[in-house]
């Protein structure tokens, strides 16, 4: 397990008081206005104001914790939506509009060329529908993930040319298609690129390149996704304020924005809020069928619903089959056909989940067979014929588990590997991969996610090169802390105060759902959920208790029992039960009550030592155990079963300041064969190995490393 610190933000008490008062007054005035037929006495106003102050404190606390301390700024944020900037401020938007409008006037066929992910599909649908509504002769085309790969290809361009089309408009791709753009130009095809990815030094040859991340672009908001840029293009073609365009295609832009994990701030917040409202009352048969399929018909739709229910199904088409299925659903105008497609996408998504778990299992078996891979700063895993459509998700899962950058590569029958990598905050995966460009066939991406192609015979060299770069650039790779907003007490929480947090939504990138810390909470029970795939804990503070689900953690993996006292990092929500509205939680992390951040800091040093990172004498001394401490650790492991994947309860028992020494002791005992991590009922526990002769602790490699000067 990767241990990480918790960073609970500090709140200025004076600012909190001022914010609470401002929010309460605003809410009271709104209530008075809504009840303007009723005359309010001064006494009633004061009474309502006092009640509002009680309920506004939690919301004000989150705002203050996130640095929003000015009441005017806070009220503006809570009021709703930022104005959308003029689409014509995007560089080359005028050129793009001029060429497209000319094509419409002259009856030219326009090909909208998208991508196979949700952003690419929604961007394609958005622009296709709008151009069709303008009377254009328009077709759309999506690449195949396996057959074509990402973005424009010469084969696709040739196919478009052979069909007599002479204008291509890309959405969510094209900014890096330098060779392909030159090929299109050589055939006499005009190319308009709309994209949101970071350009390379050389821009493609095109009639227009609309990308807010161009160095010479002066539009105010740079966080648009591909569907967001397509939305701006539609507004520019219409010559209307973009807010008006939201009424027609805000749902598509919102789904693309959330699915592509774009920051839900600024203009994206406006787009997504409008799109979510539209989704709840959508008249698109495709979205109606999909909402019915996932059990959201007639219910409020949130950004989280898009992330965890809608987007995975739309994405599954491009991962496992053809993204055309997702596009057909979004564009479908027949209810029966839409229902068929929505059900098909769910079936494909189940297939995706099964395939993903097979590869996760295979990857874990690799790590179990070669545990030294876990000491790598960058974990590179590969396998024959792993489905390339899901290796990115597998990489994400392994990053969550290991706390390190992970690249997963699928090797085909021709000996070529296609890889997808995910990173952690503070480690630029793209730069790391770029340092190996001479042995790669292709690569691309950004700091947090990247892809590559490599020959099978170069994979071992690639593993070494990646880790050499990481050793130079990030000698001690610390896991980013868990950012917590507020420490709260259950006795002081109310259903209404938690409900008011909805004003901060939509939640997503750069605007995460609030994280709360429950200190000194007593575990009153651990229960299996969904046949043991997840678990639910009952936690008590004072006179109040709450049920909190822990996704992906089955009961046997929980290193806490009834009666244990813990600190819990959780998110809060409200659900309707037969007993009325109730609070519920989702566990993010648990640790023993009072355990601070020293444990995570020392665990990072031990991890660095095991990877061969040179430590200072002071650092070595801080984690070097005396023989007596190793004996103490051995006796603890002998006395009871300790979870191998989460030793925080042992850290708390033996002293947080001894965390590094405890981890070194466990590693040394394992290295000399005195203990082993055994799988028992789906969880790993440390167990003693029956003695087979005398063991010498001094032979443990980790202790030898500490002795080196």
Regions found by a protein language model. Name each.
Residues 120, 145-150, 198-200, 217, ...:
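Short, small-residue-enriched loops and turns at beta-alpha junctions
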Residues 126, 205-242, 246-258, 629:
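Short alpha-helices
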Residues 171-224:
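Histidine/acidic-residue-rich, glycine-tolerant segments that coordinate divalent metal ions
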